[in-house]
């Protein structure tokens, strides 16, 4: 019997909303330009899986970097992004606009979208947002596992800003002006709602779980899911066991599908997405 392939299904556009693979590549843990059975993905396996578009996240860990190094590490990531795309130009191309996305995917190549995960990369300066945009960044995740100058993280018990900060609201408005995608995965509950309130454009949660299924502060409540959907946004269900189920048993594809179904039931199928 012939193995099932992604290409056996009706034609559609498949976009993976989040991967840390570029960070792994930067750190020398994996070469995503070469096929491998290790790690989340590489270009060869993406092609085999029928992936049309991929958001590559660059993030600098505050536990590994010092304040003042965050922006430069993110800029280093933009260079790494350009380098891997150039090495595999026959299979993948960086895209910065919807028209470029359509052109690249129509040509049968993977559209690579660059993101920065964690507003701490701005180091409290809005001009760094413009710098990132000029370097091709089109997605910014407001927080990572740490609160920053833009707002509070779901992982931070202190919540210093009580949601989105004044600078965070300015950053949201600037991203709206630039046409960037705003990502609220990792954000504290109030940061999510404040971001939705401040943004004139749809907002995504690129890699989150469902709190109704797994009571975990990184996961979204039903109220947040409905609010993101009402704003025209999309939620990507994260493929990590401790986001998907309460028990410590190994998660299965059924757990992922049940989370996607939950979003479809309370917000509609247009708002359920696929992360890495």
Predicted region positions:
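Alpha-helix-loop-beta-strand connector modules within alpha/beta enzyme cores
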Residues: 85-86, 160-178, 195-205, 266
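Short N-terminal signal/transit or membrane-insertion segments
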Residues: 69-77, 163-171, 200-217
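Aromatic-anchored, glycine/proline-accented short structural segments
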Residues: 190-233
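N-terminal hydrophobic targeting/anchoring segments and the immediately downstream early-domain regions
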Residues: 1-159, 215-275
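Histidine-centered catalytic micro-motifs
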Residues: 14-22, 187, 205-209
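Metal-dependent enolase-superfamily TIM-barrel catalytic cores that perform enediolate-based chemistry
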Residues: 135-189
């Amino acid at each position: 019997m012939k193995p099932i392939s992604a290409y056996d299904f009706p034609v559609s556009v498949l976009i993976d909303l989040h991967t840390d693979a570029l960070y792994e590549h930067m750190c020398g843990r994996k070469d995503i330009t070469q096929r491998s059975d290790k790690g989340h993905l590489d270009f060869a396996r993406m092609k085999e899986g029928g992936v049309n578009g991929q958001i590559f996240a660059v993030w600098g860990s505050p536990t590994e970097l010092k304040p003042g190094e965050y922006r430069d590490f993110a800029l280093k990531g933009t260079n790494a992004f350009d380098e891997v795309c150039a090495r595999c130009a026959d299979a993948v191309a960086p895209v910065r606009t919807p028209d470029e996305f359509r052109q690249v995917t129509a040509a049968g190549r993977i559209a690579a979208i660059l993101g920065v995960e964690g507003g701490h990369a701005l180091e409290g300066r809005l001009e760094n947002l413009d710098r990132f945009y000029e370097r091709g960044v089109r997605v910014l995740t407001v927080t990572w596992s740490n609160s920053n100058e833009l707002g509070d993280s779901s992982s931070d018990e202190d919540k210093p800003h009580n949601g989105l900060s004044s600078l965070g609201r300015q950053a949201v408005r600037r991203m709206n002006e630039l046409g960037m995608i705003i990502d609220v995965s990792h954000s504290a509950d109030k940061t999510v709602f404040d971001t939705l309130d401040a943004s004139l454009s749809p907002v995504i949660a690129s890699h989150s779980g469902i709190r109704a299924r797994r009571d975990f502060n990184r996961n979204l409540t039903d109220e947040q899911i409905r609010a993101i959907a009402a704003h025209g946004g999309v939620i990507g269900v994260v493929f990590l066991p401790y986001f998907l189920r309460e028990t410590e048993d190994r998660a299965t594809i059924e757990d992922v599908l049940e989370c996607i179904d939950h979003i479809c039931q309370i917000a509609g199928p247009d708002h359920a997405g696929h992360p890495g």
